[in-house]
Structures are given as C-alpha cells and as structure tokens.
C-alpha cells in the first residue's frame, strides 16, 4: 500500500493526498514484534518505516547518511501533520531557545509556539535487540492512535525516533541469530564486535565523536534539533531488576546544570510511577548507573536531559526462565526485598522478548506524555539553562597556545570542541591575563600570564560552555565506599576525561576576565605541512602524532626512513633524539605532496647529518582478533587505518597454523588473558571455540625467540607474565579493591625518551589507568614507570603508594626477539592520543636491526 497522489489539477481544483490504510508491523513482517525467536533485520525495519511514511501524514522518514558498512541511517519524525508541514520553523524556534543571545525581546513568544523535542535512540548495542523491534510498533501506535493521550503527544511534541544507532550491528546480530537457531549457540552473542570498530564502546563516543554513526547523530539531530529530552534504550543483565529508570546514583557530573539534574528526577519519577501504575514488577530507580562521564551523555552539556531506560535482557529473542534463587542484587538495591526505589520485586519465571517490548513501550510513552504535558516547563527550563551558561562567571576561559609539541593533537582537540558547537576564538595580538593554571600534562609547566597572537581562547560564557568545561578542566571524582569500612564504590565508567592531559595539548585555565582582541574561528581545519630550507634530505619531528602518517606515506613510495638515536645539529639548528630523516630526490616538491593534511614541518638540509642513523621499515603487523571479541581490537584497527598502517588480522587458528615469519610484530589488544587463551565455550560452533591454547602460546614464543616482536596492550600484557618465565609480575593481582583502586584515571609517569619506544615523548607523560597491570620486573628494561608518590592528574585513585617505582611499559628480551608490555591503555577509545606514540614506536621498533 502506498500514498496515493491524485494529479494536482483536476477541473481547476487542487486535491490533497489521500492516505492508505496504515500497515501494522505484524502485517509487514509476518510476525508480531517481540515474538519468541523472531527478529527483523535492518532492511525489514527500513522497509516498514518507509511503508509507514507512505501511509500516514504523521510520519516523516529521513535518511541522514550511511553507516560504517554502508547501510542507511534513519531518523523518523512523528508529530501532528501541521507540525510536520513546518519543521523548519520549529527548528528555528529551537535554535533561538538554545542560544538566548539571539532572542531580542520576550522569550515567551518562542515558548508559546515551540514544541518539546523528544529524541529516542534505539539499539546502539545490537545484542540488546528489543528496542529496534519495538520502535516499529511504537511508531505504528502513534501513527494510527486516536485516543486523547496520543493526540496530546502529537499536538505538543516533535518525536525524533532513531530505530537504531547501529544498523550494521542490527544486521550482524540478526544474521548470527538466524544461523544459530536450534543449535547450542542460540541466544549467544555473535563472535565479532557488533559495531565494526567501537563494539560496545559506541556508547562511550559522545565527546570524542569519532565514529560515523556518532557524528551523524550529533551533526544532523542534536545540533539541529537541540532536544529537551533524550531517551536512550538499553538492556542490562537478565539476573536482576526488570527495568531501571532514572534518577541516577551519585555522582552526577557537576557540569550538568542543576535544572537538568532536577528534570532528570522529575521525568524519571514520572516513568517510575507509570510502571508501578501499570502493574509492572521489578522496577528500580536510583541504582546501578551514575551520570558522571560525558562519554555517554552529549545532551547533558547541550541543554537537555539524557535518560537511560535499561530493561533486563532475554537471550536475544529466545526466552529464558529464571527461578527466584538465580536473581542477583545490584548496586543500591536488594532484588528480593521491597524498598522505596524497588517497591515491587519480580519473583522470577519466564522472561521473553515481548516482555521487554512491553516495558519499553510503557517507559517511552510516559516520557512523551511528560514532554507533552509539561511542554512550557521543558522549553522554559531549556532556555534558562542556556541563560545560565552564557552568564557563567568562573572559569572565564581556557587558553591553548598555538605552538604545541603535537600540532595534530591540538587540531584534534579543537575539532572535538568545534563539532560539539563550542565557540572558539583566536587572539589577533598578544595578550595578558592576571593568572592562569595549567590543566594539561606535564603539570610541571609554569603558569602563564602572557600568551602570543594566534592563541586559541575558549570563553565559558557561551551556550555550550559546559561541554568545553567538562572536557578541559581537571576532574576531582568524589570517591565513596559501598558502606563504612567497605570497598570503594566503582563508578559505572571512567572518572577522567581532561583533553589537555589525554592529548598532551598545553592548556591553561583562566579564572578572571581579561582583555584581548579575539576573532571567532569559523571552522577548524588541519593545515598541510610546511617545508623550510633547501636540500634533498628531509628532517622532521617525532613529537607530533602525524609523524606516523607521513612515515607510512614515505614507505608506500619505497623511500628509506631513519630515526636518530641521539640528538644532533644540522645547518645551525638542533634536533632531538628520535628525529626522522628521509632522502628526497626531488626535494621540496616531493615533500610538499606528502604533507597534505599533515601539520608537520619538514626541514630540508643539503647534507645528511653524520651520526649512526637507524633505519626503520614499514612494519608487517599481525593484529590478534579473538572470537571472544575485544573492544580494544576494534579501536586498534580504527587507529591503525587512520594513521595508514597496513595490518593483517590473525585469529586463533592463524596463530596456531600460519607462517608467522611473514610478520615483524604481532599485536595483542587489551583483553583478559583467559579469553585469549581459552576463547569461547562449547556452545559455539567448532570454528569459533577455544582460544590460542597451549599450541598457540608455543607458536608465539617461537615467533619471538626467532626474532619477532610481540606487543601486548593493557590486560593482555598479563598473559606472557603468567605463562612464560619473563621475570616479572603484575602487582595489582595481589591487591584487593580495599587496598588499591583506579577506576579510569589519568596518572603521571616518567618516560625514558632516549629509548626508541619513548621517542617523541617528554620525560613526563600522562597515561590512562583502567583495568591496568603494573609490573615488578627482575629483568628487562623499564621504558615507562610510576615515579611519583602523587601520580593522580585527573580522576580518582586509592592506594597510589603501591605504584611507586613500578613499571608501566617494559621491553623484555626473548632470545633473538622481544616482548613489549604496555600495561596502561595507550590508545584507549581513540581518546588518549598523547600516548599513541608508544604504540606507533613499538611497531616501527620491531623492524629495526
């Protein structure tokens, strides 16, 4: 059935469209949404929404772009037909309310005309299958409903529905589920990341904004529609409460406006009441989840609330049965005992996909009703949050000097702010401030009063100043214990995000107003590199992450590249250890062609400096890819591709059977050692079962003994210590959480920057410590170690005394080869760009003689 368009002019009369009968999801799919063992794939979901659009004047479907795997990314807009006819006008109202500086006169006229914008995002985590399915039935109900509640929603709300934030994953999980129906693997997660690069971390990308899907949503929904309410649909453990609704547990990021914090309580309470009134059991609030990190909540810093609806999962679309004794309590509630925040326990029984769909529909409808009934309050508070932001008194600004050790990371940081709609100014002349505080690594830099022309200035008196502030300031996480004398309560995610520290970008916080000649930066663009001097030998710095991209481009032209094992002078200039050298037959012309979008300076000299240059080659990289999927493996692929490293993925069978001499280096991303060794269990098809096993570990040892390099990241670095006699232990293994806890913090380390792995780094750096080993070595070389009794730079730590003197990055010889252990999270979520060089250098180091 499709929308019927009658020719516009019949006998001089304009005739409007006649709408066909609205098809139900069941009619389109051939099964009820939520039926046992039935899932629609992404193509079926897209087809259904197209049918709905063709047959309802309340529904508009927009394709915003394409996903990582080239699937259509949809936004479904649902509202009253009159509203849909004037979407541009309502977007303009939202734009004005989002930035009160644009409103001349009384803001109330915009309140009277505006609608509450409610955005619902489904299925970002693709094994949480219900919400993408539910979205079709929920949209159908709104498209055809004639009841007073539906009319109230349509009149007062513009409902933005994203059926899936990860369409690629919807297909992956669906296809896996269909393949395994009726087998022991039915209901298991697929043996691959369900986002091509980020896996589960695609919901930790809301400030770094790296992935295609994240950027589509931010650029074309958040920054256009400025929603007051964001409802993010998820599923959680099957063994606890049936549904979580906000408010969240403490702490909440103090940069979230108090008005928004109060609205989370109000909205969450309304949903909580709706579930209890509907007779639903197992509803918990103010438990399990906090709201501290911006990695999960873009809208908290852009005028709206982001609430989380977490429903207990089934086994994908397969029902489960749980008896009462199998249920487990969670943080801040007892699953067997009624309490104010968990008034009606669920007693166990069958739990199926349809139950999840029903719970989600109740919660989502309650959110829309709240937005409709309190439309004026939502819009007024949205406006007041903006007013408070542009009236912020302290800090006054953050300043980033233009000359940085790592220009690439400077532009990366500025691009994050710019994409998040933060206004960036640039100083036209030198200026002075009363005082400033450095908020970047190393913290030993002196505070500054004078800044040069070209400095970047981020004033806090702007609509999205909170986004800039939470990303640029140092975090002081308020740690707490589960009970007096008990273990420390673990945050839901990390406790630090300070970008100046993570990226190694010199950043200063200025508390008091100052005068400066500033111009707004229209768009952050990475400039191409510069050529200086004359000659055919090019020298360039190792301090900029972009060095790796240039080196790899040189390798693709079959040019020889060398790095300097010590500092030197050439043509009156000094160059540090690690400086790179390349020979250009064509001189400046050849160099300039390679420097497109690489912000590096290449110094040409006529004569090759005389020292013991060490040649490096394009590393032949084998990247371990476990069927017990490691999120860090996806991030590692994304980074390697972005910096133009060729690599080959290696699974367990490859390592056991392939010719490993084809590789210079085999890289193991962060993953638990047991998952690497043992892999998936017997419920999976045979080709996915098991891990490396003893045979795979023996092959790796042989590879290193014969001259290869093994690089282990994060928790994976515990594996060789456990299985081989390397002369080292992980000291965190023997410490309890009462003695030692670092839940995602940025810590100070000392670096041997005369070792090739440390080239380009300063003597002091910042590393991300999260699920991280620290080494006590009796042999090998410590390249990076924890030297300070006060290592915390941002976040939270307990028991820091245990780290003093321990190794963070080690090189351990193994016969003719080596094992490199990088305990900290050197490329964590593509955020810790200040420590990328440890990874890049390890790969190049594997090619040296």
Sequence positions of predicted segments:
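Core alpha/beta catalytic barrel or barrel-like domain that forms the active/cofactor pocket
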Residues: 187-208, 230-248
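Well-ordered mid-protein domain cores that form the structural environment of catalytic cofactors
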Residues: 101-107, 112-114, 121, 166-174, ...
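Intrinsic-disorder/low-complexity accessory segments
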Residues: 21-158, 204-205, 210-212, 216, ...
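Carboxylate/His-rich catalytic cores and anion/metal-binding grooves
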Residues: 139-142, 156-178
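Short, solvent-exposed turn/loop segments enriched in Gly/Ser/Thr/Pro and often Arg
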Residues: 162-166, 177, 232-240, 716-717
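Positively charged n-region of N-terminal signal peptides that target proteins for export
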Residues: 1-4
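Substrate-binding cleft of carbohydrate-active enzyme catalytic domains
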Residues: 168-171, 190-200, 209-221, 226
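Bacterial N-terminal signal peptides
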Residues: 7-17
């Amino acid at each position: 059935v499709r929308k019927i368009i009658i020719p516009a002019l019949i006998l001089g009369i304009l005739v409007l469209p006649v709408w066909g009968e609205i098809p139900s999801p069941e009619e389109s799919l051939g099964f009820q949404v939520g039926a046992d063992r039935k899932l629609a794939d992404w193509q079926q979901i897209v087809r259904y929404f197209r049918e709905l659009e063709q047959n309802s004047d309340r529904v508009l479907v927009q394709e915003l772009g394409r996903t990582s795997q080239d699937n259509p990314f949809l936004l479904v807009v649902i509202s009253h037909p009159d509203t849909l006819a004037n979407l541009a006008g309502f977007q303009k109202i939202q734009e004005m309310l989002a930035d009160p500086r644009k409103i001349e006169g009384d803001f109330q006229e915009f309140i009277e005309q505006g609608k509450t914008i409610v955005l619902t995002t489904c299925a970002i985590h693709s094994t949480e299958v219900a919400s993408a399915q539910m979205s079709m039935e929920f949209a159908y109900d709104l498209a055809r409903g004639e009841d007073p509640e539906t009319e109230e929603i349509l009149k007062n709300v513009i409902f933005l529905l994203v059926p899936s934030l990860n369409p690629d994953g919807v297909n992956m999980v669906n296809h896996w589920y269909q393949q395994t129906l009726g087998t022991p693997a039915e209901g298991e997660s697929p043996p691959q990341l369900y986002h091509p690069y980020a896996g589960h971390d695609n919901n930790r990308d809301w400030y770094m904004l790296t992935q295609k899907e994240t950027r589509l949503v931010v650029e074309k929904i958040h920054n256009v529609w400025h929603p007051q309410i964001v409802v993010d649909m998820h599923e959680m453990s099957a063994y606890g409460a049936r549904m979580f609704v906000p408010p969240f547990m403490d702490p909440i990021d103090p940069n979230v406006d108090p008005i928004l914090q109060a609205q989370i309580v109000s909205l969450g309470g309304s949903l909580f009441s709706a579930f209890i009134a509907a007779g639903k059991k197992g509803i918990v609030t103010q438990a399990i989840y906090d709201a501290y990190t911006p990695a999960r909540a873009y809208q908290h810093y852009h005028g709206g609330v982001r609430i989380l609806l977490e429903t207990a999962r089934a086994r994908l679309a397969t029902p489960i049965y749980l008896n009462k004794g199998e249920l487990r309590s969670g943080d801040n509630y007892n699953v067997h005992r009624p309490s104010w925040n968990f008034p009606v326990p669920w007693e166990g029984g069958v739990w199926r996909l349809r139950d999840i769909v029903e719970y989600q529909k109740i919660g989502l409808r309650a959110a829309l009703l709240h937005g409709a009934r309190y439309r004026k309050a939502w819009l007024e508070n949205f406006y007041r949050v903006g007013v408070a932001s542009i009236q912020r008194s302290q800090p006054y600004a953050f300043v980033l000097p233009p000359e940085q050790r790592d220009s690439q990371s400077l532009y990366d940081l500025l691009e994050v702010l710019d994409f998040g709609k933060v206004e960036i100014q640039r100083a036209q002349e030198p200026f002075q401030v009363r005082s400033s505080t450095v908020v970047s690594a190393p913290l030993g830099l002196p505070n500054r009063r004078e800044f040069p022309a070209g400095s970047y200035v981020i004033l806090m008196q702007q609509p999205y100043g909170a986004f800039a502030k939470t990303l640029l300031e140092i975090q002081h996480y308020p740690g707490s214990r589960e009970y007096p004398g008990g273990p420390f309560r673990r945050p839901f995610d990390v406790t630090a995000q300070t970008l100046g520290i993570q990226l190694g970008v010199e950043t200063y916080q200025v508390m008091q107003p100052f005068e400066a000649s500033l111009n707004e930066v229209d768009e952050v663009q990475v400039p191409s590199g510069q050529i200086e001097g004359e000659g055919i030998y090019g020298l360039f710095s190792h301090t900029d992450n972009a060095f790796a991209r240039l080196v790899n481009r040189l390798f693709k032209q079959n040019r020889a590249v060398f790095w300097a094992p010590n500092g030197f002078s050439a043509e009156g200039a000094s160059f540090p250890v690690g400086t790179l050298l390349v020979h250009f037959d064509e001189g400046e012309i050849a160099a300039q062609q390679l420097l497109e979008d690489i912000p590096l300076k290449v110094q040409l000299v006529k004569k090759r400096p005389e020292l013991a240059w060490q040649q490096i080659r394009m590393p032949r990289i084998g990247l371990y890819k476990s069927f017990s999927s490691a999120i860090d493996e996806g991030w590692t692929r994304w980074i390697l591709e972005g910096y133009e490293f060729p690599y080959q993925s290696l699974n367990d069978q490859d390592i056991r059977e392939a010719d490993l001499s084809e590789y210079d280096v085999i890289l193991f991303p962060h993953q638990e050692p047991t998952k690497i060794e043992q892999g998936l269990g017997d419920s999976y098809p045979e080709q996915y079962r098991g891990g490396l096993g003893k045979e795979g570990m023996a092959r790796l040892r042989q590879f290193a003994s014969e001259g290869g390099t093994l690089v282990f990241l994060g928790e994976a670095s515990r594996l060789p210590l456990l299985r081989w006699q390397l002369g080292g232990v992980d000291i965190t293994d023997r410490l309890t959480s009462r003695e030692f806890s670092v839940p995602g913090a940025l810590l100070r380390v000392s670096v041997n920057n005369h070792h090739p792995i440390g080239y380009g780094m300063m003597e002091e750096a910042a590393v991300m410590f999260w699920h991280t080993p620290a080494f006590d070595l009796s042999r090998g070389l410590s390249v990076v170690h924890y030297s300070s009794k006060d290592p915390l730079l941002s976040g939270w730590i307990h028991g820091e005394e245990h780290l003093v003197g321990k190794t963070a990055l080690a090189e351990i010889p193994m016969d003719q080869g080596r094992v490199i252990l990088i305990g900290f999270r050197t490329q964590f979520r593509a955020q810790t760009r200040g420590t990328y060089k440890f990874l890049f250098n390890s790969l190049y180091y594997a090619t040296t003689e």
